[in-house]
Amino acid sequence: TPTRRQRQMCIRDREKAGYKAGKEIFLALDSAASSFFKDGKYEFRKSGGGVKNSSEMLSFYQDLCVKYPICSIEDPMDENDWEGFASVTESLGGQVQIVGDDLFVTNTEFVKRGIKESSANAVLIKLNQIGTVSETVATIEMCRKAGWNYVISHRSGETEDTFMADFAVAMGGGQIKTCLLYTSPSPRDQLQ
C-alpha cells in the first residue's frame, strides 16, 4: 500500500544518509483512527486492508512495531474507544509512546480518566484547544504527576508566530509536533 511504501522509503532514505533505523531513526505515527472509524469498525477499504475491530487493530499495531522502528503512535483508536486505547497501551506502552489527542483534547477531566484507566501514556497538548494557558499547564502538571509524556502541538490554521516553540521549551517536555517544513507557508516553529 502507499503508506507501507512511504514508511519503507523513509527508513531507506535515512539509512542512505548514514543513520541506523531503530538506533538513530524512529517513526512516530499519527493514525487519526477516528477518521476511518465507521459503525463500530475501522475501515481500510481504500488501501485494501478491509475492516478491522479493536482487537484486529491492536494486532495491526503490534505487527507494525515488529516491522518498523516505531517510537510513538498517536490516536491508534477512535476517540470513544477507551478500551481499545487501553489494550494498545497495555500491549505496546512499555516500548512505544501511546499518545491521546482526540481522546483527551487537552482536557483535564479526560486526562484524569485516561490515567485511571491506563488508556495511554502520553497526551498531545494543544494550547488553544482547552482555552487558557493555566488550563493547559494544569493538564501538563497532571501528566507529569502520572509519569506520562506530553507533546506540545500546533493546531492547523494557526499563525506564523513562534510562541508554540517557546512554550514547548518552557514546559520542558522535550517534544513538539509541528507541520512539515515543506507544507508550511513559514516553518518558523521548526527554525525557532
Q: What annotation goes with each model-predicted range?
A:
Residues T1-R7, I11, Y182-Q192:
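Single conserved hydrophobic/aromatic residue that forms the stacking wall/gate
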